């Protein structure tokens, strides 16, 4: 038999070799398959881990979900401290010399003052208050876009025609009244001099309709009250829902006609739901000069 097998192999050598090679290849393939499955499982685990980590990182970057409070436009927004009561006397601040506008009809010579007892250090100091007045009145979106008006920052002994005063809450109420029970500023002649009274609480805290943008609110406050001094005595309602609010609208209190009417039915506001967008400028889109 041994002789026959050797003869058979000698006569047909390829069959046994091929069979042996095929068997070896199958064993290698099975082993590689198991290894490949194992590698894929590890890859899947790694991929899942990376995806989970990324999702966790994404969640970590999201703000916490907190209940939203109702905005009460009649209240001061949260913010820094302000002065409840000052001394009802004033000192001059800022540098004179700022000027802007043509003044074809009206030249306003203004002085900037702060009430004794008001601490301006929390918002840049006395000069920062005066600089904001100067910059706002000189802005091309402001009143000087109309050639009828001109502003000049002068000293208190240089015959000013308008005093712009940063005033404590208590003094503001005496100067402006407190009939509607909300913090406001005003233009008044109660002292015999034309005066814009800037309520410090509003300068510090702003107003809810401006959604925390203190700079834009301060610009609005200046332009609105100076507008009264220029002769724009009447307030102006929101002309259409979604429009920019007129500068002479009482944006400190609300941007909605019906809500403003509810505060004072004798005012000009119609009883409609039109709500404007906050706007600090008389001419928000000035013509290119």
How would you name each of these model-derived features?
Residues 107-109, 161-163, 195, 244-245:
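A residue-level signal for beta-strand positions that form part of recognition/binding surfaces
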């Amino acid at each position: 038999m041994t002789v026959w097998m050797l003869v058979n192999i000698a006569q047909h050598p390829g069959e046994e070799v091929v069979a042996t090679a095929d068997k070896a290849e199958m064993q290698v393939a099975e082993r590689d398959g198991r290894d490949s499955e194992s590698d894929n499982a590890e890859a899947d685990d790694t991929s899942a881990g990376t995806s989970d980590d990324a999702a966790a990182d994404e969640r970590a970057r999201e703000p916490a979900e907190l209940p939203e409070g109702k905005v009460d436009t009649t209240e001061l927004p949260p913010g820094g401290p302000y002065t409840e009561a000052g001394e009802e006397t004033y000192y001059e601040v800022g540098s004179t010399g700022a000027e802007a506008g043509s003044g074809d009809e009206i030249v306003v010579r203004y002085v900037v003052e702060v009430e004794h007892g008001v601490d301006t250090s929390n918002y840049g100091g006395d000069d920062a208050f005066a600089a904001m007045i100067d910059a706002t009145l000189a802005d091309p979106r402001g009143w000087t876009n109309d050639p009828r008006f001109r502003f000049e920052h002068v000293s208190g002994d240089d015959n000013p025609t308008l005093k712009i005063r940063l005033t404590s809450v208590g003094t503001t109420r005496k100067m402006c009244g407190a009939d509607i029970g909300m913090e406001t500023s005003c233009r008044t002649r109660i002292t015999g001099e034309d005066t814009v009274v800037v309520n410090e609480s509003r300068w510090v805290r702003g107003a809810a309709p401006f959604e925390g943008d203190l700079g834009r609110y301060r610009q609005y406050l200046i332009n609105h009250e100076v507008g009264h001094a220029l002769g724009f005595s009447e307030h102006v309602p929101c002309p259409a829902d979604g429009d920019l609010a007129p500068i002479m609208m009482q944006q400190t209190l609300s941007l909605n006609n019906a809500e403003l009417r509810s505060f004072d039915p004798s005012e000009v506001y119609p009883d409609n739901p039109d709500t404007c967008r906050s706007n600090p400028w008389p001419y928000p889109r000035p013509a290119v000069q």
